[in-house]
Amino acid sequence: MAMLASKSPFPAPLATSGSGMMAGTAQASYPPSRRAPAVPPASQSFSPTESEFSDSDDHDSPKHWDEDKVCEYLRSVRCGEYEKLFRKNHINGENLLEMDKDVLKEMGIEKVGDRVRLFLSIKKLRTKAIAGQKKRNRDSFAGHESMYTPVSESPSKPFHSSSRVMPNPSVNKRYSRQIDLSGMAYDPSRPTTSSRPTSPLPSADFRTARTRNPYVGQQPTPTGSLRGLGSPPDSQANSRPVLTHTRTDSGMDGSLMAALPQNQDVIRVISTGGVTKVVKIADCNTCEEVMRVTLRKFALREDHERNYCFWVLSGLDPDPKQCRRLGDTELWRVIKDQKRPERNRLILRRVPAGEPGQSELERAAAIAMEEAQQSHSRAMDNVGARSQIKVQKVLGENWDNLQPPLSPVLYQDRERNVYNAARDLERPEPLDSGRLQPRRKVLRSFGGLRPPSELIASDLTTYFPDHPREDIDRTARLSMRRSARLSKVNSRLSVASSFSMASSIQDAPPIPTIADSWLQSTPLPKARPRDLQSRLQHGYRDSVASSMLDTLQEEGSPIEPNRKSYVSFADSGSDSAAVSVTDPDGNIVRHSYFDEGSTIGSGSGSGSFGDVSKALNEDGEDADEDLQSFLSGESWDDSKWMKGALIGQGSFGCVYLALHAITGELLAVKQVEAPSPGANSQNDARKKSMIEALKREISLLRDLRHPNIVQYLGCGSSAEYLNIFLEYVPGGSVQTMLNSYGALPEPLVRSFVRQILNGLSYLHEREIIHRDIKGANILVDNKGTIKISDFGISKKIEATNLLNGANNNKHRPSLQGSVFWMAPEVVKQTSYTRKADIWSLGCLVVEMMTGTHPFPDCTQLQAIFKIGGGKATPTIPEDASTEAKAFLAQTFEMDHNKRPSADDLMLSPFLTPIT
């Protein structure tokens, strides 16, 4: 019999009763009251569906893309840098849809992040293409099935066949529904065939079509023959097209996870974000050893096994209520019993984090659903013939038509993509769509923390996605050129100077601008070798130039080292963005572009901003208006800096990475949305309060200069935002470290506490109370330097408050800060002194030693009553050293007058080992 090709076009309307010999014969064979359907000649065959199971795809389908279209797609997913690589390998749309991570790696895409992003984009593209073809399949099938109507008005009961024949392989590895119109004529030699479609989506469509028209897809009669159009009217079998299903293995089966290997001691563990790994536990004899092996597999600290636990999902839905934590006894039973399905989807969680997140639950549910599908398939394949007959009698349906359950992952992913695409297409375009801001890209972390400046400088386009590569490259290039130019100018000025650079810094009057002048730096010892010099002075900010420029070599003969000094940027091995200035005595002092309170030279000496600006005009090079504007203090309008990825956000606003367009210095900009003019809504009142808090923070920070306090650089405003520019601190907060690594070891706590006390001592000397010392507000850079941040609720001590004390109701202290870190006098609102920060410091030490806040068993309201009652103090960790317990006992003194100051605590034995 003639089977039709999958690409044959579907003919126009079928021939009339008078067109075609077969049709005429059929008409003559029946009484006038009945007439057979008009059928084209048997030599013409076609596919009625034109679905994803045939090769007749839409021309716009990704399968038909050429190399130019593929390159355009790469640019749309921010992978345009690999355009040449794809062209070199002649990748077209058909090749693109078949690519996976291994293929991308073999092509030469070295970055893991780019491979993952590109693979996920290709996967979504593949899913979208299949979903579109699936819709065309349904529409086409519904449009064509009406052409195959039954001969009789009353349908006959279908006969069932218990035979099961393996599906025939197809050449193009697709499903294909094909119709053999010659089968409508009587053919006694035609064999009895039946097939069981095992593809979830096609079979679902077929079942829907068969429900709408019971004559489509019925099985042949038990005699193995079909009565043709010439059969008598009382024929039991009606003429209909015969559908033949073919199937081979598909490369897009949607499988999520393979089953664990049999007879091997392994478990599958799901971690944060739905990441799964298979862990070998053959050599583990206790649950603690299992936990340590698991932590090692996920690159976590093994000595923190007590901070982690295992959870398991009981049902098939990602519902936290169906999730339970496993104790050691139950965990051991699960991992040792290879018949337990839970060992294939254990969830690893930190104990303080509580129940698993949504991503972990979804991954566990998907694995459980796939296990259920595989179990169903195995059960169906192992059923005997007698059992099949019983099932057919009970269900009233042919065994071969019983469909396996849909693949949950495949179905959910595809339906979700189809729904999202349809929703995006049907959504009306808003009137102010031109003003909508694109969704901000979150700063890509580095080991769970903020990336160092070297990493940002090596891939600026990733961290500044809203700016063209040309603008970013020009900024980096100009910043290096300007740094070299300033080095030459300051070198000439220092040679002409008759006094030491260090002394001029102290005598320099401040310039009344936001970025007034250079910061007065502590002179370092004599010049050291380059490898040692790079380790000094980590308390300066990062810049693109500091990561790209090598240190300029000192000019002049070694015989006359006092003849010259030079200015250069730190080498790439340091995070310093400061300018290194060597004075005639050989001392090195470093400055940054935005440091205030000092100048390079006094008003009449060399090195002041005025002298530098004058020297730039006389150095014979082209005028640089942007640099002159920067030297005059005009540094913070929107054209002078570039907004990068999102670092963090909170109730106050958002913090973004920023790049100064003149100097190439990396910054952090805190943005608060400005209230609408004349608006009095509750939201605008909240914005005004945040603006006031930000202004209060600016007024305090602009006068602070300390290596353990986040450096304020300047501020600016626009019609929509108020911006405050701070130094960029790579790394993260203490709270982030605790979330990532658990409790900190005591030697590290000692180091952090000493630096925090240095910063608090500096603040308290200037009558400033921070009022919110906690792990989230203490930053740790990638060199281990502490930075105290977030001065939004800090304030200066008023003399009237100190004199009148708690009896001054007009200036009654407000309840400011975080409840778990509050001192008793703050909760009672009796007084607010420097000693409140000391209590909060003790709570911070407990937080670092335990990994949780000081009152983990209390809600905020319960903690307020506990602390305000004056009888409860945070529990001191039992495993703390004697010195640490004594230190905490001093900080938790209930009477704030007896509580030691920051300077007194610096002499504590707890901090002695690191002095």
Swiss-Prot record:
Residues 641-911 form the Protein kinase domain. ATP binds at residues 647-655, 670. CDD domains: SAM_Ste11_fungal. It is an enzyme of class 2 (transferase). Disruption phenotype: Produces much less aerial hyphae and conidia and shows weakened cell walls and higher sensitivity to cell wall-degrading enzymes. Impairs the formation of appressoria and the ability to infect rice plants. Residues 65-128 form the SAM domain. One of its GO terms (biological process) is positive regulation of developmental process. Its EC number is 2.7.11.24. Residues 26-45, 152-163, 188-203 have a biased composition (Low complexity). Transmembrane segments: none annotated. GO terms for molecular function: ATP binding; MAP kinase activity. Belongs to the protein kinase superfamily. STE Ser/Thr protein kinase family. MAP kinase kinase kinase subfamily. The N-terminal sterile alpha motif (SAM) domain, but not the Ras-associating (RA) domain, is essential for the function. This is Mitogen-activated protein kinase kinae kinase MST11. The gene is MST11.
